[in-house]
Amino acid sequence: MISRGSKVRILRKESYWFNQVGTIATIDQSGIRYPAVVRFENVNYSGTNTNNFALEELIEVSEVETKSKEA
């Protein structure tokens, strides 16, 4: 399941970051059209490194690593 910190591949063909991997910064739960904010290493033509995507436009590459507490 896609969650904060997950690595995702972009499927939106008209995106600057098409087929590149980014990290989920946040996921909005309010029901908006593009709830996932994805952060990238490189910037686009206007100098930004984040963009909003629909969950259907993303494929999870690797899950976020959870830290387990050892007793």
UniProtKB/Swiss-Prot annotation:
Primary subcellular site in the record, as a coarse category: plastid
Annotated InterPro entries: Elect_transpt_acc-like_dom_sf, PSI_PsaE
Highest taxon above the source species: Eukaryota
Pfam families noted in UniProt: PSI_PsaE
Record's bilayer topology term: Peripheral membrane protein
Keywords: Chloroplast, Membrane, Photosynthesis, Photosystem I, Plastid, Thylakoid
Keyword Thylakoid: yes
Assigned GO CC terms: chloroplast thylakoid membrane; photosystem I reaction center
Stored Gene3D superfamilies: 2.30.30.50
GO biological process: photosynthesis
Cellular localisation: Plastid, Chloroplast thylakoid membrane
Task of the protein: Stabilizes the interaction between PsaC and the PSI core, assists the docking of the ferredoxin to PSI and interacts with ferredoxin-NADP oxidoreductase.
PANTHER family, A to Z: PHOTOSYSTEM I REACTION CENTER SUBUNIT IV A, CHLOROPLASTIC-RELATED, PHOTOSYSTEM I SUBUNIT IV
Protein family per UniProt: Belongs to the PsaE family.
Name under which the protein is recorded: Photosystem I reaction center subunit IV
Organism of provenance: Trieres chinensis (Marine centric diatom)
Name of encoding gene: psaE
